[in-house]
């Protein structure tokens, strides 16, 4: 089997395609969360702290500038993304549990076989 053919089979497997979609959606979601944190949450926190730009907060030790405000902003980004993923996974697990608890629909063949069994059982008891 050629290397190209093996790669094509690998790339077209369901799991790989699902992963690719998840990565693209994750990148897009990260942009939304970053915009939320940078544009809404951090300015509000800055207003509560007296109009301070949180991302610009830093202190200097010797020649090194420690940008702790930027770090704080990224921590808030991470917490929001992690919480959103947690909620999404909880929702998916809940839906999967509900689906697993639903009885499987009875097919027409099974229903017909059940009726035949019941008729045979009734007829054998009459003999």
From Swiss-Prot:
Superkingdom of origin: Bacteria
Subcellular location: Cell inner membrane
Keyword Transport: yes
Pfam families cross-referenced by the UniProt entry: MscL (PF01741)
Transmembrane regions: 9-29, 32-52, 75-95
Main location: membrane
UniProt cross-references to PROSITE patterns, sorted A to Z: MSCL (PS01327)
Membrane-topology descriptor: Multi-pass membrane protein
Gene3D superfamilies hit by this protein: Large-conductance mechanosensitive channel, MscL, domain 1
GO molecular function, one term: mechanosensitive monoatomic ion channel activity
GO CC, any one term: plasma membrane
Keyword annotations: Cell inner membrane, Cell membrane, Ion channel, Ion transport, Membrane, Transmembrane, Transmembrane helix, Transport
Family according to the record: Belongs to the MscL family.
Function: Channel that opens in response to stretch forces in the membrane lipid bilayer. May participate in the regulation of osmotic pressure changes within the cell.
Subunit structure: Homopentamer.
NCBIfam families referenced in this protein's UniProt entry, alphabetically: mscL, PRK00567.1-4
HAMAP family xrefs: MscL (MF_00115)
Family annotation (PANTHER family): LARGE-CONDUCTANCE MECHANOSENSITIVE CHANNEL (PTHR30266:SF2), MECHANOSENSITIVE CHANNEL MSCL (PTHR30266)
Protein name as catalogued: Large-conductance mechanosensitive channel
Lineage: Bacteria, Pseudomonadati, Pseudomonadota, Gammaproteobacteria, Legionellales
Name of the encoding gene: mscL
């Amino acid at each position: 089997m050629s290397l190209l053919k093996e790669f094509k089979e690998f790339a077209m497997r369901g799991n790989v395609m699902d992963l690719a979609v998840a990565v693209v959606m994750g990148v897009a979601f990260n942009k939304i969360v970053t915009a939320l944190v940078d544009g809404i949450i951090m300015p509000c926190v800055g207003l509560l702290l007296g109009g301070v730009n949180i991302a610009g907060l830093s202190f200097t030790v010797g020649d090194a500038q420690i940008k702790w405000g930027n770090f704080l902003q990224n921590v808030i980004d991470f917490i929001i993304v992690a919480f959103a993923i947690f909620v999404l996974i909880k929702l998916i697990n809940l839906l999967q549990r509900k689906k697993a608890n639903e009885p499987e629909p009875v097919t027409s063949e099974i229903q017909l076989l059940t009726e035949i069994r019941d008729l045979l059982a009734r007829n054998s008891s009459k003999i």
